[in-house]
Amino acid sequence: MAAKVEPFWIRKTLDQLDHEEWESLCDGCGLCCLQKLEDEEDNSVYYTRIACKLLDLKTCQCSDYPNRMKFVPDCIQLTPGQAEEFKWLPPTCGYRLVSEGKDLPLWHHLVCGDRDAVHHERISQSGRMLAEGSVPEDDWEDHLIFRAG
C-alpha cells in the first residue's frame, strides 16, 4: 500500500512554496481586493463591498494582474515574509489559513478541483460588489460587510 502524500500546503511552510504553489493558494474570492477601512482605536480591519477599480465584479479576478502595481500603487502584494501580518485577511483565505497551520476548506479549488466553488458557496462577493468609482469615499462606511483581524 502506498503511503499517503500530504498536500503541499500541509507539508510546506509559506517560505518553502515555489511561485506556482504560492499563486495557487489564492482561491479567487477577490476579497483582498475590496476596499477596507481600519479602526484607529483597535486596528480592526473592516471590509466593504467596494471593489478595486481593476477587479472584475463578476469573476473576482484582477483585470490587469501583471501590471496592477502600476495602476493601483497601494495594491496589496502578499509575500511569505508577511505571514505574521495575515490576520487582516479574511478567515477563509488560503494564505491566512496556511500561515496559521490550518487546512484549506473543502470548497477551495486545490481540494475540490473546481475554481468556481468559491462563487457557488458564496465565499466571494461575485455579483454583490460595487465599483470603486460609484461610491464616494465618505460613504464607504455604509457598505461594510465584515470585520477581520
UniProtKB/Swiss-Prot annotation:
One family name in Pfam for this protein: CxxCxxCC
Organism: Pseudomonas fluorescens (strain Pf0-1)
The protein's name: UPF0260 protein Pfl01_1392
Upper taxonomic lineage: Bacteria, Pseudomonadati, Pseudomonadota, Gammaproteobacteria, Pseudomonadales
Family named by the database record: Belongs to the UPF0260 family.
Top-level taxon of origin: Bacteria
